[in-house]
C-alpha cells in the first residue's frame, strides 16, 4: 500500500506587484496555516519519506514550514515541473518515477494541478471528504490518498482511496 499527500501551497501575498508570480511569498495567513498542516501530518502518522515541491517561493516556504513540524529532516526535491502547469500528466509521471519505498510521498504544488490530480486519482474514499475536496481545494489544503499498489510506476487514475481531506480552517 502506498500513500500520497497532495498539498496546495499556503496563502500567498499579492502586496508587491513588482514580484513575478514565481517570486510571490506567503502572507501572514499562509505563514500561520502551513505549520498547522505540518503538525497535523506528524501527529497523525503521515510524515513523508520524500517531499517533492514546486520551485515557486510560496511553495518553498510552505514546504519549509510544514517540514519543520516533522520529527526529523525529510529528503526534499524542488522541481520546476511542479510550477509550470501542463496538465495533470506531468505531476502524475513525476510520482510514477519515484522509488517504491518512498511512501508516504508528499507533493507540494499549485492549483489547478493539485485539485485536478487529487480528483483524477481518487475513485473511492470518505464521501464527506470527497465532497469537500470537489467543492473547493483551498490554499494549504491536504489530500491524503491510499493506493493498493506495490509500485508508484503502477499509479493510474481512479484507483486511489481518499483517506482524508484537510483544510487549515479545520485545524
Regions found by a protein language model. Give the residues of each.
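Glycine-rich phosphate-binding loop signature in dinucleotide/nucleotide-binding domains
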Residues: 44-46, 97-103
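Short glycine-enriched nucleophile-adjacent loop
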Residues: 67, 118, 122
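Domain-level recognition of soluble alpha/beta enzyme cores
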Residues: 122-163
Amino acid at each position: 500500500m502506498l500513500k500520497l499527500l497532495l498539498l496546495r501551497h499556503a496563502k500567498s501575498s499579492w502586496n508587491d506587484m513588482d514580484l513575478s508570480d514565481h517570486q510571490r511569498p506567503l502572507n501572514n495567513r499562509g505563514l500561520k496555516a502551513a505549520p498547522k498542516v505540518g503538525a497535523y501530518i506528524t501527529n497523525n502518522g503521515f510524515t513523508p519519506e520524500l517531499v517533492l515541491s514546486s520551485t515557486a517561493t510560496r511553495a518553498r516556504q510552505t514546504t519549509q514550514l510544514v517540514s519543520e513540524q516533522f520529527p526529523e529532516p525529510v529528503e526534499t526535491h524542488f522541481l520546476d515541473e511542479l510550477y509550470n502547469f501542463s496538465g495533470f500528466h506531468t505531476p502524475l509521471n513525476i510520482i510514477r518515477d519515484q522509488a517504491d519505498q518512498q511512501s508516504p510521498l508528499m507533493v507540494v504544488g499549485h492549483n489547478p494541478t493539485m485539485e485536478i490530480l487529487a480528483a483524477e486519482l481518487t475513485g473511492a474514499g470518505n464521501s464527506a471528504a470527497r465532497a469537500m475536496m470537489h467543492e473547493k481545494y483551498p490554499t494549504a489544503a491536504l489530500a491524503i490518498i491510499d493506493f493498493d499498489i506495490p509500485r508508484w510506476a503502477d499509479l493510474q487514475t481512479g484507483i486511489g482511496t481518499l483517506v482524508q481531506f484537510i483544510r487549515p480552517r479545520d485545524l
